[in-house]
UniProtKB/Swiss-Prot annotation:
Its cofactor is Mn(2+). One of its GO terms (biological process) is gluconeogenesis. Substrate binds at residues 88-90, 119, 164-166, 186-188. It catalyses: beta-D-fructose 1,6-bisphosphate + H2O = beta-D-fructose 6-phosphate + phosphate; D-sedoheptulose 1,7-bisphosphate + H2O = D-sedoheptulose 7-phosphate + phosphate. This is D-fructose 1,6-bisphosphatase class 2/sedoheptulose 1,7-bisphosphatase. The keyword S-adenosyl-L-methionine does not apply.
Amino acid sequence: MDRTLIQEILEVVEQAAIASAHLTGLGKKDEADAAAVEAMRKRMGKIEMQGRIVIGEGERDEAPMLYIGEEVGSGSGPGVDFAVDPCEGTNLCANNQRGSMAVLAASDRGGLFNAPDFYMKKLAAPPSAKGKVDIRKSATENINILSQCLGLAVSELTIVVMDRARHKGLISEIRATGARVQPISDGDVQAAIACGFAGTGTHCLMGIGAAPEGVISAAAMRALGGHFQGQLVYDPAIAQTSEWADYTKEGNIARLNEMGITDVDKIYEAEELASGNNVVFAGSGITDGLLFHGVKFEPDCTRTSSLVISTLDNTARFTNTVHIKDGAKSIALS
């Protein structure tokens, strides 16, 4: 991958964000997702690359495009693997709430873990805590370590947790330490990445979310030098989700084994989930969030706010783009 390709990857998430933003607040989460998928796929098709979707909208028979294994791009050029979530936080987008974004991770071939559509226990923390906090430790232990690493009192720490029934005990434990809990309804990718930047007011992400999004978070945190660990969750009693109402622990283990995952309890580091030589994260806000603004529509232009993080040159670039409409008469500076 080179800088030209990275610029095109940025445009992929910008176009997906704009497409979804036209449906923000209309209560149409499926339509918003479909619009983002179509826009992302269309822009990817214009890139000189041999692209491949390793994490996408589902298996080939489950999704019309951006399905797992789909080839994208011109068919010539560098081989690139993608993990995509064209509209992360579809409910947030549908209800015009904070935190929805178009997001992807990219790497050279074989550089992204092909995560199954399972749940994942996650731990994200700032670079100063990398290798010191550990997903095997209790929330209390990790909070005390985090306090020491950041030079903050425990009461000054904010821990982000998905607002789910399965996290009732975790939230109680965090609050018992004196740390603050910030529950989120959806969209833990942006929350995880925010832990990698000072000044966001977010210091740690704990709890269980979707495994595919864990790979995207890991790619960003690896490029930032932040801490990220993930462990697949296969026990329905732990996941506590209606989606697994008919599943069993033994059945899920068998499913993982069929996918080639025999060590079902393995703890994955960021460098294992995103192991490529060149790893890129790109995200563009659909609605306002922790890291960037959402799409803004104006008479003569559309504005997007995005972030690209790359191991190629060890940079994190925040980009505000003005997409000028045909026949525009005047463009405000901001």
